[in-house]
Amino acid sequence: MSKNLILILNCGSSSLKFAVLDPKTGDEKLSGLAEAFNLEDARIKWKLHGEKGNADLGAGAAHSEALTFIANELLSEELRSSIGAIGHRIVHGGEQFTSSVVINDDVVKGIEHAIQFAPLHNPAHLIGIKEAFRIFPELKEKNVAVFDTAFHQTMPEEAFLYALPYKLYKEHGIRRYGAHGTSHLFITSQVAELAGKPVDQTNAIICHLGNGGSVSVVRNGKCIDTSMGLTPLEGLVMGTRSGDIDPAIVFYLYKNLGMSMEQIEDTLVKKSGLLGLTEVTSDCRYAEDNYEDASKPEAKRALDVYSYRLAKYIGAYMAILGDDHLDAIAFTGGIGENSGHVRELALNHLKLFGVKLDVERNLAARFGKSGVITADDSTFKAVVIPTNEELVIAQDTAKLAL
């Protein structure tokens, strides 16, 4: 039997997303999510050959139990024997990894070294790798790491350096790394296809907007700047993350309000963003649904700040491209693909550049529908393109391990 399928694992600190798909066609045989790890109600849900199912994993279950369930209960002998390799999404690869790699001892050490930049995610990825080796021993030499930071490693120094003492970069690797690179890479290829150009001649500004959010600017198919920084905390307003703030706010919270560093980190990472601005929820849909409701001013406040910050990044990146033709401003991710309101508010700030929204096209582009959302006489195109990070991971894994 042909081993032409890829098992994809995306291990978070308390969850595991998984899929089995054909890297050539994108055909998905299995997909699912195991969540609430280490809690009483640890559970798993899946879609197998189009049929949905769910099960309890047992109190305290985590990555090991979830992967064991997938292997024993969801993968038939035929499906398992068709899997030729395993692709792991890795949030942070530091400077060491500029592309996807087959996992060996040195790669594991590199992922361990980058834990300092992704303390929640990278340890979970390492658990996923270890468990994949144990549960699928026949594929031990066929595990591939696909790094979210790799796409951004083409940034020039002026984009990735912070104006800090240079030795902090040379000795400790403190610099801009970015995130969501797998999504930005996929959307770049889709913009190229839309423009009828080779990827290495494509220029784009890509807005990946979900609970986390980032913008990148691409020249000739390569990332030249991105909004996330050393960690995924920098940049846009996000669901619970603050994005850009005056660094001195940290000193103020510590000295004047008596907050500990742990409390400050918790505030910036888990209690800010849309949640902080609304004081109700991190869900963008609340702000959209109540935007015109005068009795809920927090909704308009949150969406206006969110969209304004987004527009600032898009405008700055348009300036950075200079004379290079911009093929498209692309929106993707849960909010980018579905929130016509956010797209409208952000693009309305860019009229100086000749960006002209088509209201009907913008409203139509949602729920998985892609398309151009600007008017025919707009100076630049804005498009909505659903992302497919799993397909990129599968394709990279297939190139290296099949």
From Swiss-Prot:
Q: Which BP terms does GO give this entry?
A: acetate metabolic process; acetyl-CoA biosynthetic process
Q: Which GO terms describe its cellular component?
A: cytosol
Q: Which residues bind substrate?
A: R89
What does UniProt list as catalytic?
Answer: D148
Q: Which residues are recorded as binding Mg(2+)?
A: N10, E389
Q: List the disulfide bonds.
A: none
Q: Where is this site: Transition state stabilizer?
A: H180, R241
Cofactors needed by this protein, per the record, are: Mg(2+); Mn(2+)
What catalytic reaction does the record list? acetate + ATP = acetyl phosphate + ADP
State its location(s). Answer: Cytoplasm
Q: Which UniProt keywords apply?
A: ATP-binding, Cytoplasm, Kinase, Magnesium, Metal-binding, Nucleotide-binding, Transferase
At the top of the EC hierarchy, this enzyme's class is transferase
Name the EC number(s): 2.7.2.1
**UniProt xrefs under Pfam families:** Acetate_kinase (PF00871)
Q: In which pathway does it act?
A: Metabolic intermediate biosynthesis; acetyl-CoA biosynthesis; acetyl-CoA from acetate: step 1/2
Similarity comment: Belongs to the acetokinase family.
Q: Which HAMAP family match?
A: Acetate_kinase
| UniProt function note | Catalyzes the formation of acetyl phosphate from acetate and ATP. Can also catalyze the reverse reaction.
Its assembly, as annotated, is: Homodimer.
* The protein's name in its UniProt record: Acetate kinase
